[in-house]
Regions:
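Residue-level signal for inorganic ion chemistry
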Residues: 52, 123, 149
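Inter-helical turn/loop segments and adjacent helix faces that build the functional surface
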Residues: 60-66, 126-138, 153-166, 170, ...
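Conserved small/polar residues in nucleotide/adenosyl-binding loops
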Residues: 219-221
Length: 221
C-alpha cells in the first residue's frame, strides 16, 4: 500500500457521501456560503483526516459498520480542518493552496473569514448534537489548540533557531491535535476502554506528526 488513495479505499464511498453531505450542511439557505462550500469541497484533496476517522470507526466496530454518529464525527473533523485552512490562508495572505484558489482570493477576505467562522459554528452545533460530553470536550480542545498553534507559528515565523521540540509542539496544535482527538472521540462513541482510547489518541497524533515532518522535508529537498 503506497498511496493515500489505497489507504482510504475501504471508505471511499463513505468519503464521497461525506463531501456531498458537507456541501448540503454548510451551504443550505446561504447563497454565498453555498458557493464557498462548493468551491471548498469540490477542490479535491486527500480527505485524510475524515478518512482515518472512518477507518478507525469501522475497525473498532464489532461488525465493521459505521454508525450515524461516527459518520457525523468524520464530518465535524473535516469542517474543523477546512475552517482552520480558510483562516490560515487569510492570515498568510495565500492566493492558492495546492494549486487551487483560496476562498479569499476567489471571493474576498470578508467572505473567507465569515465562511471559516460559519464552519466552526456548524462543527460546534453538530458536535453538541452528538450528545456526548466527553466528545465535546475533546473536539473543543482541538479548536483551542488550532488558535494556539497559529499564534505560535506567527511568533516564531522568523526564528531560524527554533528547536525541533518547539516545531513538534506547534505542529501538534495546528494539525495533530485534530486527528488525535478525533480518533479518540471515535473510540469514545464506541465505548471502548481507557487503554485503547489512549492508543487511538497516540496513533492519530503520531501519524499526523509523521505526515507533517515528511511534508516539510519534501519542501526543502
Amino acid at each position: 500500500m503506497n498511496t493515500v488513495t489505497e489507504l482510504l479505499q475501504p471508505v471511499e464511498n463513505d468519503l464521497d457521501d461525506l463531501i456531498l453531505e458537507l456541501k448540503n450542511l454548510i451551504g443550505a439557505g446561504h447563497p454565498i456560503l453555498q458557493a464557498a462550500a462548493e468551491h471548498l469541497f469540490s477542490a479535491g484533496g486527500k480527505r485524510l483526516r475524515p478518512g482515518i476517522v472512518l477507518l478507525i470507526s469501522k475497525a473498532i466496530s464489532p461488525e465493521f459498520i459505521l454508525t450515524s454518529k461516527h459518520k457525523r464525527l468524520a464530518e465535524i473533523t473535516e469542517m474543523i480542518h477546512t475552517a482552520s485552512l480558510v483562516h490560515d490562508d487569510v492570515v498568510d495572505e495565500a492566493s492558492t493552496r495546492r494549486g487551487v484558489d483560496t476562498v479569499h482570493s476567489r471571493f474576498n477576505t470578508r467572505v473567507a473569514v465569515l465562511a471559516g467562522d460559519f464552519l466552526f459554528a456548524q462543527a460546534s452545533w453538530h458536535l453538541a448534537n452528538l450528545d456526548n460530553v466527553n466528545v465535546v470536550k475533546l473536539l473543543s480542545r482541538v479548536i483551542m489548540d488550532l488558535a494556539e498553534g497559529e499564534i505560535k507559528q506567527n511568533l516564531n515565523r522568523f526564528d531560524s533557531a527554533q528547536s525541533f521540540s518547539k516545531y513538534i509542539n506547534k505542529s501538534y496544535c495546528k494539525t495533530a491535535s485534530l486527528i488525535a482527538n478525533s480518533c479518540k472521540a471515535a473510540g469514545v462513541l464506541s465505548g471502548i476502554n481507557d487503554e485503547n482510547l489512549t492508543s487511538l489518541y497516540d496513533f492519530g497524533k503520531n501519524i499526523d506528526l509523521a505526515f507533517q515532518v515528511v511534508d516539510l522535508s519534501l519542501i526543502h529537498i
